[in-house]
């Protein structure tokens, strides 16, 4: 058992100190910091001249005051600096061409009273400015039309206000709208964490085994400790590497959100990922299914890596495993909108999909305990089977050198393990 801990510690330390780990962690942390501080970064580069200067040519000589009022309601961030111009259309157009102005809006009204507008700029690639002006002019049209008909603005506002429709689950024990809102953030997080963890760390395990095999170190290791101990020492070692990396990334993100609570980006992200009111049961299930997903695919990756003779062949060999993960993730993404769909229920009992899809159902629905227990049991049984078969393939596979298909290599590994 002492050798097990020595190998686990060796694997963990080697991976933690590796340049690839340090670089990937730093890059990911920087990306998280950029996302959580996006507003501050944008304002830093834009400065005080960030507002777009827009001139309005009001050919009606009466609509600009109403338009200006509606624009203030639409442009809540104050990104546009809009002013009425008394100059002619040609003169203002010249200013736009000279880049004294970013754009111009011409407001017209025909004989029938229909209000229209034309927006001019050097380029029309900035859809946000156009949409803001269009929305303000549309509201101007509504305000002017209703005023001429003698309808008050308050009446119009009440007519256009969206109808509030509450949701109430009638099934006993079903999750309420509030409970779903609280758990959806955790479900999203766990689906992505499981997906990326399996993709990254399972590939790392396969690469680790293939690397040691190519250096002939494996032959010495196999003779010094049981293959199943060796395999799980690597799985746990790299698993701890993953937990360390996730802890650093999540810690950096949480700290950044706390320091930028007033920013709109931080508040929206923090609101979506609000886990304070999530039930303890859901959190426990999240941990269980994360561990199951990791060990399931890590065990599979370990013995796939052991039958590879060249490091260059690792990605090709683990491609079927990667496709399984991608398929499970895509099904889970669809299931977020329809967690009670029949095929979601069926696929949640397929062990390679269970960690993601069963957790989705546990988080979004109030399923019977026996369904979650069966899913966990099937996955555990699959892990045990993969571990037993994998240990034999691992033992024989590390002694295989030469080019052959994965299927032939597995058969040869099982045959060597018996001898």
UniProtKB/Swiss-Prot annotation:
Coiled coil: none annotated. Pfam families: ABC2_membrane_3 (PF12698). Keywords: Cell membrane, Membrane, Transmembrane, Transmembrane helix. It is a multi-pass membrane protein. InterPro entries: ABC-2_transporter_component (IPR051449), ABC2_TM (IPR013525). Its main location: membrane. The chain crosses the membrane at residues 16-36, 186-206, 235-255, 283-303, 318-338, 340-360, 369-389. GO terms for cellular component: plasma membrane. Signal peptide: none annotated. The keyword Mitochondrion does not apply. It is found in: Cell membrane. It comes from the Bacteria. One of its GO terms (molecular function) is ABC-type transporter activity. To M.jannaschii MJ1024. This is Uncharacterized protein YhaP. It comes from Bacillus subtilis (strain 168). The gene is yhaP.
């Amino acid at each position: 058992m002492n050798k097990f801990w020595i190998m686990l510690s060796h694997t963990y330390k080697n991976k933690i100190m590796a340049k690839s780990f340090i670089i990937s962690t730093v890059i990911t942390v920087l990306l998280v910091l950029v996302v959580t501080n996006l507003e501050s970064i944008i304002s830093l580069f834009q400065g005080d001249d960030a507002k777009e200067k827009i001139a309005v040519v009001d050919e009606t000589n009466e609509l600009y005051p109403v338009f200006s009022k509606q624009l203030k309601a639409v442009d809540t961030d104050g990104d546009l600096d809009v002013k009425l111009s008394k100059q002619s259309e040609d003169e203002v157009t010249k200013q736009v061409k000279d880049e004294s102005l970013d754009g111009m809006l011409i407001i017209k009204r025909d004989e029938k009273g229909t209000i229209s507008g034309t927006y001019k700029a050097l380029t029309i690639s900035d859809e946000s400015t156009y949409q803001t002006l269009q929305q303000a002019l549309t509201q101007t049209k509504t305000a002017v039309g209703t005023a001429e008909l003698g309808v008050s603005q308050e009446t119009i506002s009440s007519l256009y206000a969206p109808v509030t429709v509450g949701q109430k689950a009638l099934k006993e024990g079903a999750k309420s709208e509030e409970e779903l809102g609280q758990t959806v953030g955790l479900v999203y997080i766990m689906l992505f964490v499981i997906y990326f963890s399996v993709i990254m760390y399972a590939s790392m395990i396969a690469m680790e085994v293939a690397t040691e095999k190519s250096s002939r170190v494996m032959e010495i290791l196999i003779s010094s400790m049981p293959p199943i101990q060796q395999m799980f020492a690597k799985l746990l070692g790299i698993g701890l590497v993953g937990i360390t990396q996730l802890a650093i990334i999540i810690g950096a993100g949480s700290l950044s959100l706390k320091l930028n609570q007033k920013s709109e980006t931080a508040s929206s992200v923090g609101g979506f990922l609000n886990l304070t009111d999530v039930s303890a049961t859901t959190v426990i299930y999240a941990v269980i299914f994360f561990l199951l997903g990791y060990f399931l695919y890590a065990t599979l990756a370990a013995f796939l890596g052991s039958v590879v003779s060249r490091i260059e062949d690792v990605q090709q060999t683990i491609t079927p495993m990667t496709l399984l993960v991608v398929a499970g993730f895509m099904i889970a993404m669809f299931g977020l909108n329809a967690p009670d769909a029949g095929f979601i229920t069926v696929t949640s009992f397929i062990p390679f999909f269970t960690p993601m899809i069963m957790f989705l159902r546990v988080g979004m629905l109030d399923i019977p305990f026996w369904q979650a227990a069966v899913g966990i049991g099937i996955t555990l049984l699959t892990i045990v089977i993969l571990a037993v078969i994998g240990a034999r393939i691992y033992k024989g596979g590390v002694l295989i050198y030469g080019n052959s298909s994965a299927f032939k290599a597995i058969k040869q590994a099982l045959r060597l393990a018996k001898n």
